[in-house]
UniProtKB/Swiss-Prot annotation:
Binding residues for substrate: 88, 94, 126-129, 154-157, 235
Protein name: L-lactate dehydrogenase
Similarity-based family: Belongs to the LDH/MDH superfamily. LDH family.
UniProt-annotated location(s): Cytoplasm
Residue positions binding beta-D-fructose 1,6-bisphosphate: 159, 174
A Pfam short name: Ldh_1_N
Organism: Streptococcus sanguinis (strain SK36)
InterPro entries on file: L-lactate/malate_DH, L-lactate_DH, L-lactate_DH_AS, Lactate/malate_DH_C, Lactate/malate_DH_N, Lactate_DH/Glyco_Ohase_4_C, NAD(P)-bd_dom_sf
Protein's UniProt keywords contain DNA-binding: no
HAMAP family membership: Lactate_dehydrog
Subunit structure: Homotetramer.
A single Gene Ontology CC term: cytoplasm
Annotated binding of NAD(+), by residue: 18, 39, 46, 71, 85-86, 107, 124-126, 149
């Protein structure tokens, strides 16, 4: 757990497009004092090169130790961030990645735990809700110390899309996407607000959007990744900054409320899955979920989303290899 020492150490596992963008975001924002980057042996030199390149920005930002790391370096880390995994290709859903990325995740988590690591896992590889669950299972860690990026990026996309339509700074638009980080996610329209004014009331007063506009807006948010992947091959800047925000909340013990993939223990009638909902996060991980009162339609969407994730998990855990590796 973090905040037990003044030195703030992050280990990044995976130096691909997401990982390297995350590392750049940490440097730009002056987050963490030490950053180790782990890559597979055949890409070790890339990690060395990225560490060197990033270090050349430190004179413009703040001091930080940056280096190509090994799993042994995880032993005294505050936070291990997992971005490594097979990338989502055009035409693939995040859930299509399950088989490939569960095996990768098992190898990573096993080696991190064997180092003596006793901090917090932050998972961003897709499908993130399933891989957050597998990180919890393979690590044996308490659920509070295994966190997925969840719907943090989706919620940011939602806020920005609304902000652009109504001409308001996105930081003054408060709205959440909940559920799976993927096709079954949903917008929590019942609590969306602009500077404390319910979105419904705002729209009645300003007539910025009609009902069909809102439907189209949500679809554009839900399908944003597919659109970007078709245009440029991958998404990485948005999720990198989302991960940096979560990292700062943990290292600085902010007790910030962020939409993350967190373990469900009956809230919304859902159990035994990690799924996107707001939660308080600080130096010890998840302090507690924030159970926003959903209306009936939203609750049904949450349950349907969880059911899809549960089916994927149940199918995956028929694999004896994953059963044997489970510690939770």
């Amino acid at each position: 757990m973090t905040a037990t020492k003044q030195h703030k150490k992050v280990i990044l596992v995976g130096d691909g497009a997401v990982g390297s963008s995350y590392a750049f975001a940490l440097v730009n924002q002056g987050i963490a004092q030490e950053l180790g980057i782990i890559e597979i042996p055949q890409l070790f030199e890339k990690a060395v090169g990225d560490a060197e390149d990033l270090s050349h920005a430190l004179a413009f930002t703040s001091p930080k130790k940056i280096y190509a790391a090994t799993y042994a370096d995880c032993a005294d880390a505050d936070l291990v961030v997992i971005t490594a995994g097979a990338p989502q290709k055009p035409g693939e859903t995040r859930l299509d990645l399950v088989g490939k990325n569960l095996a990768i995740n098992k190898s990573i988590v096993t080696q991190v735990v064997e180092s003596g690591f006793n901090g917090i896992f932050l998972v961003a590889a897709n499908p993130v809700d399933v891989l957050t669950y597998s990180t919890w299972k393979f690590s044996g860690f308490p659920k509070e110390r295994v966190i997925g990026s969840g719907t943090s990026l989706d919620s940011a996309r939602f806020r920005q899309a609304l902000a652009e339509k109504i001409g308001i700074d996105a930081r003054s638009v408060h709205a959440y996407i909940m559920g799976e980080h993927g096709d079954s996610e949903f917008a929590v329209w019942s609590h969306a607000n602009v500077a404390g004014v319910k979105l419904e009331q705002w729209l009645q007063a300003n007539r910025d959007l009609n009902e069909q506009d809102l439907v189209d807006l949500f679809i554009s948010v839900r399908d944003a990744a597919y659109s970007i992947i078709n245009k440029k091959g991958a998404t990485y800047y948005g999720i990198a900054v989302a991960l940096a925000r979560i990292t700062k909340a943990i290292l600085d013990d902010e007790n910030a409320v962020l939409p993350l993939s967190v373990f469900q223990e009956g809230q919304y009638g859902v159990e035994n899955v990690f799924i996107g909902q707001p939660a308080i996060v600080g130096a010890h991980g998840i302090v507690r979920p924030v159970n926003i009162p959903l209306n009936d339609a939203e609750t049904q969407k949450m349950q349907a989303s969880a059911k899809e994730l549960q089916a994927i998990i149940d199918e995956a855990w028929k694999n004896p290899e994953f059963q044997e590796a489970s510690k939770n």
